[in-house]
């Protein structure tokens, strides 16, 4: 078996395939494992760290929770007070307008109820005419049609920290699907892996030993007959790997650049080609003291402002210093980068005056722009009004001896680390089921 990608999806697939007794090789173009899970330790004081990629784990995300515990990793609860909400007041100064951001989510859900009821009649099937009609509208168009007030519009803009897309870019189906789910749409109880989320990827990689090859990029795939032949590039040298099955976990943003012989089915090709990835800039700011802490105040905030959403990135760690994590999605990613280009990190610090940033010194910082990462080309997938909803199942559909995984293939947990883990384990189970039936 060959697994393309050593992110959580690929490593989870390899973990289960090894348990089934398969011989597994994993390749990844990066010089590390983890993919879009990236724990940053270098440069921070007091041996602190924070997540520059996948960060929070919800308590109902069973697959990643079970896998972490299976590997002996502890989950630490974080952000117990949930998210607050920040927006500009009449004088254009940011201020905390809601101690509980869930109220904004509730108002959106209430306004969406007529659309949600219809969507549920279709049993939330994306191949239904109902879903297709909903999906053709952008969130911005729906806000205009329903004469949404400024508060509701600001909440929708703030969701770019969740979907990584602005209301003009995001299909209404994304909101409707989120609020139609049985679980609470707003964030609930949240955790991180103690010591860093990258410990999960590292633990999964240990059994692979010499069967893990980093700095090895997939450049072509041929799938004829009873096997798959994968062309890879390593240190400018081309070679080929033959395998019985290929688990392809690369994001669609990268996958669509890889030639397949023969070509993938037309619907699958179109699904991969059309799927969009959100702009996402993650900035980690370490301060000399945790000035943002105050009685009754949340440690996390959503906002429609240039810095995006922010939260305490290391509340579970000791030390006087503390790290604020800023996630700027969609247009906020561009705005955050502009601030840093013109003013340096000090510009972001000034943008946090409302939180009390003048009461501490910035001692270290790190920024990762995921749309500039050649092996991600974005934070994670989102659905725009141009995506044909009937194509969504094709993202996860096996093709001959190739199975597909990655957060973009998950139905319930698309965009989450749990979606990556779940999809990788599903891909391994699909190979087992296919092999047993032959």
Regions found by a protein language model. Name each.
Residues 1-438:
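FAD-dinucleotide binding site
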């Amino acid at each position: 078996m060959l697994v393309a990608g050593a992110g959580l999806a690929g490593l989870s697939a390899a973990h289960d395939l090894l348990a089934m007794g398969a011989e597994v090789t994993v390749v990844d173009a990066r010089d590390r494992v983890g993919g879009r899970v990236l724990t940053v330790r270098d440069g921070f004081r007091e041996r602190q760290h924070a997540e520059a990629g996948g960060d929070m784990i919800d308590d109902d995300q069973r697959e990643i929770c079970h896998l972490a515990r299976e590997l002996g990793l502890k989950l630490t609860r974080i952000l117990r007070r949930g998210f607050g909400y920040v927006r500009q007041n009449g004088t254009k100064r940011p201020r905390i307008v809601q101690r509980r951001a869930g109220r904004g989510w509730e108002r959106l859900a209430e306004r969406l109820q007529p659309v949600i009821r219809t969507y549920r009649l279709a049993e939330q099937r994306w191949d239904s005419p109902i879903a297709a009609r909903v999906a053709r509208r952008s969130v911005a168009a729906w806000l205009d049609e329903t004469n949404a007030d400024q508060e509701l519009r600001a909440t929708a803009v703030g969701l770019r920290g969740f979907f990584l897309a602005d209301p003009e870019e995001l299909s209404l189906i994304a909101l409707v699907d989120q609020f139609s789910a049985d679980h609470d749409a707003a964030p609930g109880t949240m955790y991180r892996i103690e010591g860093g989320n990258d410990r999960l990827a590292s633990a999964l990689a240990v059994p692979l030993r010499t069967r893990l090859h980093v700095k090895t990029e997939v450049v072509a795939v041929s799938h004829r007959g009873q096997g798959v032949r994968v062309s890879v590039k390593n240190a400018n040298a081309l070679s080929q790997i033959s395998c019985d099955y290929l688990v392809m976990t690369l994001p669609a943003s990268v996958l669509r650049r890889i030639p397949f012989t023969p070509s993938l089915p037309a619907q699958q090709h179109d699904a991969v080609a059309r799927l969009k990835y959100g702009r996402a800039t993650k900035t980690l700011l370490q301060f000399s003291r945790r000035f943002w802490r105050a009685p009754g105040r949340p440690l996390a905030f959503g906002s429609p402002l240039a810095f995006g959403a922010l939260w305490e990135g290391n509340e579970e760690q000791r030390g006087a210093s503390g790290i604020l994590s800023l996630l700027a999605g969609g247009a906020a990613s561009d705005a955050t980068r502009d601030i840093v280009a013109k003013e340096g990190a000090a510009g972001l610090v000034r943008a946090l005056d409302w939180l009390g940033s003048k009461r501490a010194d910035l001692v270290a910082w790190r920024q990762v722009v995921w749309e500039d990462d050649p092996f991600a080309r974005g934070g994670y997938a989102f659905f725009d009004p141009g995506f044909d909803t009937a194509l969504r199942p094709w993202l996860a559909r096996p093709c001959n001896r190739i199975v597909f995984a990655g957060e973009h293939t998950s139905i319930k947990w698309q965009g989450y680390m749990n979606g990556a883990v779940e999809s990788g384990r599903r891909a391994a189970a699909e190979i087992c089921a296919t092999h047993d039936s032959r």
